[in-house]
């Protein structure tokens, strides 16, 4: 089993896509990249942390390349600190890796993707230093709150788009 930690906008949206994926064992939303011991409130108030999803996956069933390809389909890697209506540094596009092999793969992936994108890809690649699990009410948010307004307006259409691709 391997882990990759991704930030690409609201962590509810990113998790909703990856928790349904064959080969993904578990997902967990959290915070990384800022001050220690963050809370949702401190993140929203600019403590430097990014909303992220830790993806635990079986590399015999799904590759990191497949995960990154989907990641680039579900968010805009050319947008600085913004995804749709969600604006702030906590929505930064970032790949947190745990080993050099994954770092190199991510760098090569972005280099190849840049040939496709007309705008500059701003997705950062950084070694995972700290990770803090988000509050329990954020975990598997879409599964637990499918009728909530944000889920219906933002997450459900994103899932429908991915399923039709």
From Swiss-Prot:
Designated name of the protein: Peptide methionine sulfoxide reductase MsrA
Keywords: Oxidoreductase
The species this protein was found in: Campylobacter jejuni subsp. jejuni serotype O:2 (strain ATCC 700819 / NCTC 11168)
Chain's gene name: mrsA
PANTHER family linked: PEPTIDE METHIONINE SULFOXIDE REDUCTASE (PTHR43774), PEPTIDE METHIONINE SULFOXIDE REDUCTASE MSRA 2 (PTHR43774:SF1)
Entry keyword annotation includes Oxidoreductase: yes
BP-aspect Gene Ontology terms: protein modification process
Annotated catalytic residues: 10
GO molecular function, one term: peptide-methionine (S)-S-oxide reductase activity
Broad EC category: oxidoreductase
Family per record: Belongs to the MsrA Met sulfoxide reductase family.
Role this protein plays: Has an important function as a repair enzyme for proteins that have been inactivated by oxidation. Catalyzes the reversible oxidation-reduction of methionine sulfoxide in proteins to methionine.
UniProt xrefs under NCBIfam families: msrA
Catalytic activity annotation: L-methionyl-[protein] + [thioredoxin]-disulfide + H2O = L-methionyl-(S)-S-oxide-[protein] + [thioredoxin]-dithiol; [thioredoxin]-disulfide + L-methionine + H2O = L-methionine (S)-S-oxide + [thioredoxin]-dithiol
A Pfam family: PMSR
EC assignment: 1.8.4.11
């Amino acid at each position: 089993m391997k882990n990759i930690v991704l930030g690409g906008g609201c962590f509810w949206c990113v998790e909703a896509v990856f928790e349904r994926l064959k080969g993904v064992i578990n997902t967990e939303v959290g915070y990384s990249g800022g001050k220690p011991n963050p809370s949702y409130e401190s993140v929203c108030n600019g403590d430097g942390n990014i909303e992220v999803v830790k993806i635990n996956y079986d590399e015999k069933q799904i590759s990191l390349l497949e995960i990154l390809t989907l990641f680039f389909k579900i968010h805009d890697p050319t947008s600085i600190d913004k995804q749709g209506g969600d604006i702030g540094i906590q929505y930064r596009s970032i790949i947190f890796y745990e080993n050099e092999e994954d770092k190199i793969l991510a760098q090569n992936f972005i280099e190849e993707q840049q040939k496709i994108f007309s705008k500059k890809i701003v997705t950062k690649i950084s070694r995972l230093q700290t990770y803090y699990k988000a509050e329990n009410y954020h975990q598997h948010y879409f599964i637990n709150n499918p009728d909530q307004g944000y889920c219906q307006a933002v997450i459900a259409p994103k899932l429908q788009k991915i399923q039709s691709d």
